[in-house]
Amino acid sequence: MKFSISSLKQVQPILCFKNKLSKVNVNSFLHPKEKVIFVMGATGSGKSRLAIDLATRFQGEIINSDKIQLYKGLDVLTNKVTPKECRGVPHHLLGVFDSEAGNLTATQYSRLASQAISKLSANNKLPIVAGGSNSYIEALVNHSSGFLLNNYDCCFIWVDVSLPVLNSFVSKRVDRMMEAGLLEEVREVFNPKANYSVGIRRAIGVPELHEYLRNESLVDRATKSKMLDVAVKNIKKNTEILACRQLKKIQRLHKKWKMSMHRVDATEVFLKRNVEEQDEAWENLVARPSERIVDKFYNNNNQLKNDDVEHCLAASYGGGSGSRAHNMI
């Protein structure tokens, strides 16, 4: 039976899947939702690296979801990606607010992130939301407006690392950050009367260095050295606590979003001894598996199987067949 495009608009087809009848608009079936990728994980797990890997392979851009990295400044302490690490991938909502600005609520973040997602999709770019503030991600997905779930298909990739292994890495990372100028960076913004519950001063490392910076000019060298050691130990301890808290929240969200969340175990990467081995393990155990996840996410949602299309047309018109493939990569 021949049919025209206009006839498609006039009939509401009844599709039968697994012996269940359901009315489905043909247009929504032939034109699937746009896509959004979320890269999640505890601090230090490699979220930013994976997000950039995926962005370079799928023409994406990254939307930051770390509540501390929203602010300008303290780039070493907050572990912002460097221009070299970005590899030319644009980042949004990264270092955009003044350090003295107040705290951005989850609702406010959801609005800003939604605007960024819409803009990127309109420009045929894949939005990749990445960061450690899982409360922001949960608020964005579950926003009362229904913006995200009504307009986008979501895929969540969880970069997981065994907590003892991650804690060891985080401890060494703090040492590297100290060598890279963390102390000098915090000293520049130090204010003995500052409120450590607002803005960028909430970052782990700022409150911990308060006593040292307040007293460094008043004590002898030995006392000063001991005070700095205590501050660094507290930075490491509180970062480990943060990683544990983030992991628990992700595990809760995994139970909630299980069908859409994919766990990628990066533990072996962190156990390698040299950079070459780490890079090879990352590519084989994290980057390529994640690339396959995203590729499958695209194809499963964007390509209609011939049987599905024939079923659609047969139910609506009593016969005929056709197919239409959508490949957004």
Curated annotation (Swiss-Prot):
Residues 1-40 form a transit peptide. Induction: Down-regulated by cytokinins and up-regulated by auxin. One of its GO terms (molecular function) is AMP dimethylallyltransferase activity. Its EC number is 2.5.1.112. Belongs to the IPP transferase family. Involved in cytokinin biosynthesis. Catalyzes the transfer of an isopentenyl group from dimethylallyl diphosphate (DMAPP) to ATP and ADP. This is Adenylate isopentenyltransferase 7, mitochondrial. It comes from Arabidopsis thaliana (Mouse-ear cress). The lineage of its organism: Eukaryota, Viridiplantae, Streptophyta, Embryophyta, Tracheophyta. The gene is IPT7.
